[in-house]
């Protein structure tokens, strides 16, 4: 045991110090600036080494990585290609990518703080632009299909919906439901009135909507397929562009389907877009969808579905958005969705109790 402990301690000591090659790299003044920026942004107590993994060692999630990249680009004066940045994992890889890009483009990002710099540039991906500008005729076709979905769900899934009167007369806004199953999207869309439906758009994972028939169908109802992990910047810029055009975005803040049906941790994408574009977020609570089509099941089964639309959450009127702004707005959104979801479950439980009596 003592020998194992000694080996672990020795291994830790070695891992806490840079190698000779890394020490040479760290001696560069630009690298020192970059490492200082990374150290300030990291929430981890671990030392920032060239080999440190941005996610596993330093705790940067996908959103925080984008913010870090912007800070480094502003500090070093280079703008790395988003596709290159999405493929780096360590401190050294990230810093080298930005240093190598310095001078290869007309100039660094505008001197704006954080997400302002990211969202100041519109996406140039033709797939994004095509999806956002699909025809109104196609939208009407999907709207009629949604009426059939709503009727089918009311008859066979005993769908019950409340709070639709809280939806605004017009956009732009963000609609944020919790995510339980593949039924969520069609059912929520089927409840949107035409005045809003005609200008709705969606950001979906390219894992599902990136190719084949689903990719074709997605483009016809304004779904932008992106990889939120490796191409988060494109996803956020697509959301921002649509909102700037007066459209309204359906965005699932959990980013994936719940394992057990309960709302999980919310990502801050909706909060960032709301704060920077000054648009409200309308929370939506879904229940019963997980019972109908849980993860791992090939086909859905019959189960009572419930949807509740909530009051809008307005972004704070702050002159400068900060990490604390995003955190508070995200917590408020999750708290509102969780409260409504619990209300739906309590009502369902009370009705089952009355029926049993």
Could you tell me what each predicted segment is?
Residues 1-130:
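Phosphopantetheine-dependent thiolation modules in NRPS/PKS and related acyl-activating systems
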Residues 72, 175, 251:
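Conserved S/T- and glycine-rich ATP-binding loop of Class I adenylate-forming
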Residues 1-7, 234-357:
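Non-catalytic C-terminal accessory region of glycerolipid acyltransferases
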């Amino acid at each position: 045991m003592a020998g194992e402990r000694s080996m672990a301690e020795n291994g830790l000591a070695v891992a806490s110090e840079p190698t000779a090659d890394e020490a040479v790299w760290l001696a560069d003044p630009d690298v020192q600036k970059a490492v200082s920026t990374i150290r300030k942004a990291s929430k981890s107590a671990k030392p920032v080494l060239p080999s440190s993994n941005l996610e596993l060692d330093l705790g940067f999630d996908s959103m925080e990585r984008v913010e870090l990249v912007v800070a480094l680009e502003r500090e070093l004066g280079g703008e790395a290609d988003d596709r290159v940045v999405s493929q780096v994992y360590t401190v050294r890889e990230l810093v080298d990518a930005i240093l190598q890009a310095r001078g290869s483009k007309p100039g660094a990002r505008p001197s704006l703080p954080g997400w302002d710099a990211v969202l100041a540039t519109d996406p140039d991906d033709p797939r994004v632009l095509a999806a956002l500008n699909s025809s109104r005729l196609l939208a009407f076709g999907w709207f009629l299909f949604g009426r059939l979905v709503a009727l089918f769900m009311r008859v066979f899934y005993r769908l019950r919906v409340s709070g639709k009167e809280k939806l605004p007369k017009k956009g732009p806004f963000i609609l944020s439901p919790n995510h339980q199953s593949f039924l969520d999207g069609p059912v929520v869309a089927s409840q949107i009135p035409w005045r809003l439906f005609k200008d709705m758009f969606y950001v979906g994972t390219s894992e599902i909507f990136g190719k084949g028939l689903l990719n074709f169908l997605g483009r016809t109802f304004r779904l932008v397929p992106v990889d939120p992990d490796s191409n988060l910047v494109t996803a956020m810029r697509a959301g921002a562009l649509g909102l700037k055009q007066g459209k309204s975005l359906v965005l699932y803040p959990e980013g994936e389907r719940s394992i057990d049906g309960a709302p999980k941790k919310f990502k801050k994408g909706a909060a960032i877009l709301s704060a920077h574009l000054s648009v409200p977020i309308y929370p939506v609570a879904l229940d019963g969808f997980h019972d109908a089509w849980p993860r791992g099941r090939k086909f859905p089964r019959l189960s009572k579905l419930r949807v509740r639309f909530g009051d809008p959450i307005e972004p704070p009127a702050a002159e400068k958005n900060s990490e604390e702004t995003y955190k508070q707005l995200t917590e408020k959104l999750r708290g509102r969705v969780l409260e409504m979801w619990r209300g739906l479950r309590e009502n369902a439980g009370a009705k089952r109790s009355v029926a049993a009596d």
